[in-house]
Amino acid sequence: MNVVTQVRLDLLAEMEERYEKKDTQYFVKLLEHDDYVIRCRTTCILVDIGGEDKVEHIAKVLKNDTNELVRHEAAFSLGQMCYSSCILPLEDATKNDSSMFVRHEAAIALGVVGSKSAKETLEEALNDPDEPVRDSAVVALSNLEFMEKLSKNEKFAKLTGG
């Protein structure tokens, strides 16, 4: 069974050309593509292109995508962006996403962003029915505490978020 189709490979080649041009609007449109592989890749590309204006698009993916792997990638990506505007979408996903996989990643991402305002959400996540989410909340809370009290190197603190 060949899961990698020529259509997908052709689109990835086109995406590479558009990436070199930093064609943000092209990639924003691809967030609606039928292929979840393309949506995952597109989420990462938008983060790499950079800019806080990408947060709203990735937050929509986190909230609305039908595929939990794509939502997980969006949570991870928001954590890597580290903007304060990422906090509310990540808090919502930590509390409300139907997938344990996504709630876990959103909790970790909150720890990476490093905002004390997320502490209450992470403390609530300690009571999540799924152990990986609870464990992720512990990791994130540990990182928040470390960043607040001991960290001298912001880059290191962001790497230790999970």
Feature annotation, model-predicted:
Residues R8-L11, T42, A74, A106, ...:
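Conserved hydrophobic register position within alpha-solenoid helical repeats
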Residues H33-I49:
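Short, contiguous, helix-prone interaction/anchoring segments in small proteins
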Residues M1-K29:
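N-terminal "cap/leader" segments of large eukaryotic alpha-helical scaffolds
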Residues L46, V61, A74, L78, ...:
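TPR/Sel1-like alpha-solenoid repeat signature
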Residues E14-R18, I45, S77, A109, ...:
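Core register positions within helices of long alpha-helical scaffolds
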Residues T5, K21, Y36-V37, E52, ...:
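Alpha-helix N-cap/helix-start positions at coil->helix boundaries
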Residues P129-D135, V139, E154:
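Solenoidal tandem-repeat scaffolds enriched in leucines and small polar residues
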Residues R18-E32, G51-K63, Y83-K95, S115-N127, ...:
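Amphipathic alpha-helical scaffolding segments comprising HEAT/armadillo-like alpha-solenoid repeats
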